Amino acid sequence: MPEKSEFDKALGELHDLTEWEDAEAALRELHARGPEIERLYLDSKILPGELRALVMVSNCLEREFIHRRLATGQPLHMNVL
């Protein structure tokens, strides 16, 4: 089996965040991964289109985690916007 590309690895890591129960922790982790994803692009490990795809997935996940957190009736304790 061929080794996964950096894009596939990063996408898998983002997908893994969907399993987290704590939406606020998932948001923090998502924000922490942003610079890592950018570094993959700057180091030419992912293509421009792959970077755009990862950013789009990240933005969608951010909205999902915010909605999850707000659905609990508890305030967000971080500046996410």
Feature names for model-found ranges:
Residues 29-73:
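Short, charge-rich amphipathic interface segments used for partner binding and complex assembly
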